[in-house]
Amino acid sequence: MDINLPGVHAEVSAVFARYEDALVNNHIEVLDALFWPSAHTVRYGIGENLLGIAAIRAFRAARSSAGLARTLAHTVITTYGQDFATAMTEFRRAGNPQVGRQSQTWVRMPAGWQVVAAHVSLIDTPRDSPAEGRAA
């Protein structure tokens, strides 16, 4: 299996950037398009477990658009072959001492790259160094 083929990695990096822009600017239509429209799609959030695209879309529609700006760090995108990828990142929001973590599983579907599973969590600021425990 080919890992991080340059063209595939560039595609996933671009769609990840599109997702991030849509998230912080609350472009719900773009977010909806980037999630696989299936009952099998899962998004585990900080305070919610969303099973299926209907639950994910309802959450996005009801969420406040305030306070969405964030700064990303330690983003790792890995592609596996032509049609599967993971995107992991840490994030911080102004005024919140906690570190957010986001994991996404992307699959190339007929409609293009879409998230089929996602997880978001917050942790207290880690005491270890940023490089400790990270893959090279």
Walk through the language-model features, giving the residues of each.
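Short beta-strand edge/turn micro-motifs at domain boundaries
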Residues: 86, 99-130
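Surface-exposed, charged secondary-structure patches
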Residues: 4, 8-11, 43-46, 54-99
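Hydrophobic alpha-helical segments typical of transmembrane helices
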Residues: 15, 27-30, 59-60, 73, ...
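Structural motif
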Residues: 37, 80-81, 109
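Short, low-complexity N-terminal intrinsically disordered segments enriched in polar/charged residues
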Residues: 1-34, 38, 126-136
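Short beta-strand segments enriched in hydrophobic/aromatic residues
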Residues: 35-36, 91-93, 119-122
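Hydrophobic pocket/interface hotspot
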Residues: 19, 31-32, 40, 52, ...
